[in-house]
Amino acid sequence: MDKPKVNSLGSGQNNGALIYLVDDEPMLLELASAILAPLGYRIETFRAAKAALRAFKAAEAPPTLIITDYEMDAMTGLDLMEACRQIQPRQKFLLVSGTVGPDIFSAGPVRPVRFLAKPYQSKQLIDLVEAVLAD
């Protein structure tokens, strides 16, 4: 009998968790999706924080994790976190940015579970996603 295939970069213990990917750069959405989808995560991508917020509000159940860029048009990743946490206070987030560092959170009440600086390696993303989901 064949054993199930598990990607050597991840544990494979994600049970099809739903992840929202939010970034205004389509190539980065495709990259993150290509890294996470083969591990069994269900992925929904959004090119704007407002679109992700609309989907979040309309969803029957919230995503397990929202991975969002910080700097986007009209609404930042921190704005998205704050709006989602008003609805679902325990919503898990991973903030990704190439323009700010983790010190951005000291200025406000909203904190993601983790921060990942761009550019990142596949293993860094996988490890952080697994760590956030394990919390």
What are the residue ranges of the model-derived segments?
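Non-catalytic signal-transmission and effector/linker regions of two-component phosphorelay proteins
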Residues: 1-20, 30-33, 54-57, 61-62, ...
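Acidic catalytic/metal-coordinating carboxylates
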Residues: 47-51, 76-79
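Hydrophobic/aromatic residues positioned on beta-strands within the core alpha/beta folds
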Residues: 96-98
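Two-component/phosphorelay signaling modules centered on CheY-like receiver
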Residues: 26-44, 132
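Active-site residues of response regulator receiver
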Residues: 69
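Receiver (REC) domain active-site loop signature in two-component systems and cognate sites
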Residues: 72
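Conserved acidic carboxylate
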Residues: 23
